[in-house]
């Protein structure tokens, strides 16, 4: 058993000394890596990752996502990756399903969703991805304002008469 625990710690980049630490002695990123090791300890084929990096800063997010990808390749497992951050989702997922108010509103491969979003909620999520290029900040702000305006003007068309999200319609 200890051999397996050491293997799992190594898999997520933690030293053997981590065995002797209390939970409060780990950073947030280390805790997420431990959670990842626990999730794959029994060698599952499928892991549900619900907002796995949402509370982490960007550099630590990248580390955890890299460990997740490496483990995915090593164990040939699939993730159901749940997140509001489509910038993170883009790095992790080949296929996406967008949910709004508890219903699927859009489904497609990564390229379809990112290059040609159909639902206004998808457009809003995409516009929330920070643009790090200072030369494009004004353009990004303008696009966000346009999407917000479209949302306010047309949101009713995305809802059924009872106020629920309409059915998912294939394109």
What annotation goes with each model-predicted range?
Residues 110-171:
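Short catalytic/signature loops enriched in Gly
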Residues 22-26, 30:
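Conserved ABC ATPase signature
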Residues 89-91:
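A short, surface-exposed alpha-helical micro-motif characterized by mixed small hydrophobic
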Residues 36, 64:
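Hydrophobic anchor residue at the start of the ABC signature
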Residues 104-108:
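ABC ATPase "signature
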Residues 41-45:
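A short, proline-enriched helix->beta-strand linker immediately N-terminal to the Walker B motif
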Residues 2-17, 126:
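Conserved ABC ATPase "signature" region
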